[in-house]
Amino acid sequence: RLVGKPVRIFIYCMGAAGGIAAFAGLGALFGGSAGLPRFDAKHTISWIQWAWFLGIVAAAILAGLCYLFFAKVSEKLGEMLQNHRIVSCVLAGICIAAGMYFLPLTTFSGEHEMGELMSSWEEYSAKILILTALAKMLLVNLCISLGWRGGSIFPLIFSGVAAGYAFAAITGIDPNFAVAAMTAGLYGYVSRKPVMTVAVLLMCFPPVYIFPLAGAAVIASKVPMPSKMHEEEKNCR
């Protein structure tokens, strides 16, 4: 590596801060948002929420393992079809169509669908929310491995939001707290960069969420990955 860890952290923070400032400035001048909907600053943080905190982080790590498993399987499939790019891209399209039919919120990258989920998540069962999160992680890995263009950051955030709402539906805790901790834990575990995780998520979470965001991202990023999955997490860096 050309620079040390403190310099890299500084670069990540400055890059994220610059991006947030640019989005905020453009939004103030021309209207609109930064692409990701923002959660309300009003939320409940009490001992009840924090009593579930480690459980949320554990669930986020489990979701991260599912993401890495999907990435590994998708990569193997992509290698099998790398000389048949038209076939692989058509196959990815069929997978997206199937996902859209059974779980409509899994379409596209997730920014718009995240806004829909924020306003209507109580209409879905915890089972559907969990399936939506898992399907989103599977589909984004299939698309990338089978030749489609794009990245996994926004889909991963959406998956964390869906899984967080599922956790809130099961336990009855404050949904925004659950979503913040779940999303930060999932993203932090996969990316292994807690500072960058918090900086990116502050694009859709107000600063009052800094403690569950930072706590979940740091704890999850310190949990070791299975040795065979180290390469897969680089796709989310």
Predicted regions mapped to residue ranges:
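Alpha-helical transmembrane segments and immediately membrane-proximal extracytoplasmic
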Residues: R1-R237
